[in-house]
Amino acid sequence: MTTFAPSETLHRLIKHALDSGAAGTLKEAEELFRGYRIAFVIGEDQARQPLEQATLLSAVAMASRVFLGGVFVEGSLDVPLCVGGAPGGTLADAIAELGGELSGSALGRSTIIIGGPPMPRREGFCVRTICAGWRGGIAPGHSAVVPTAGPEMPLTAMLSAALAVNEAFLYVSGGTPAAGYRVVGLSLWEPAATTDWLTETGGEPQLTYLPSQLWLLGLGHLGQAYLWGLGLLPYADPASLSLVLQDVDVVTPSTLSTSILSDRTMLGKKKTRAMAAWAEQRGFTTTICERLFDASVRRQIGEPAMGICGLDNALGRLALDKAGFEFVVEAGLGRGHRDFRTMRIHTLPNGRETSNLWNADSATEAVQEGPAYEAMLKNGELDKCGVTLLAGKAVGAPFVGAVAASLTLSEILRLLHGAPVNQLIDLDLQCVEHRSIVKNSCDFSSLNPGFVLV
């Protein structure tokens, strides 16, 4: 039986309550989260649609790691499952596997409605997910907002689900008084803040090309969100996607709180092997690499030319331009209780060396002298070393990684469909409308990193 250190067992979003002062002790923080509940409602027509099924299952998989008091689903759920990679034979089976409970009524609970038309106003928190073309977002459940149609793009399911769960957590945790009362969304085809994400401008393409080879660096919070997103894409033959999966860590109880594909059966197992098993069950082809990614790693002929980076350390990122990749998309997330909803996405090459993009030493919030950590030390729960290790762990939430993964994978899809890629996407889920985008000036028109047709 594997024994885990306290720093490996702490729920990464419960840590937000400790670091922010919302809870004075770990017990108080855990009780607070056990009081968080969320309900999902899906209509009979929506329950049979692949995009709405993907939205619901993505949302349940995230919410079950956040709303520890229960995730409840109302709707006609005994329908055939039509989402690749999801567990079970029916929608109800998949919901149960992902941590949801089948419920006759969502009344009295904070509610997320999956797609469909505007609904009558409800008491309390209620938002509706929106997917149209390459655009995804949320609106108040009763809002008359209806987007113009466009060619379906499955990653909008993950995007809208993540935005909805983020909004619900903002509401229950008191993160912003506007939670649930605003329209929030973006376009994965043109993510600039100036884009009207509710309107299709004619530029969105039919999804035609998918990557055939990818190298995933890091298989934690971000890496598993990448895999979930890849699992939603419509591969005619899933075996046509070849993945190199690189990581050195094992799945810990902390992993379960942020990483969308991890479950208790994986505890103590290498992330590479657990994720390879999931990917192969989805039908993908995998190769695993269980060594640190650093400046000594070199891509060999025949290995994926495109890298997707989800590493949480600057030293690994500094080596991204030395490994021989022809194209890299990298995402980094905030670590502290104030900035954990922030993300910054880079594409490489972009005319700058990685040494000019990141510092080897990254600043962290000093929280180990907070009341919750002082209580642990005073009560003898942990010694000074244990408190320091625990306080140094990042705050994290699965909905943050899911939004970042939607944007990261979309950069690859945009490249394959001939669009200019973005050098930088800077976004905070507290205020999505204030995101900033910088276009990549490099010419990728002659790059062929490998693709297959939908």
Regions found by a protein language model. Give the residues of each.
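Conserved beta-strand positions in the Rossmann-like core of class I SAM-dependent methyltransferases
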Residues: L243-V244
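Short acidic, glycine/proline-rich loop/turn micro-motifs
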Residues: G141, S254-I260
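A conserved beta-strand->alpha-helix junction
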Residues: R282-R291
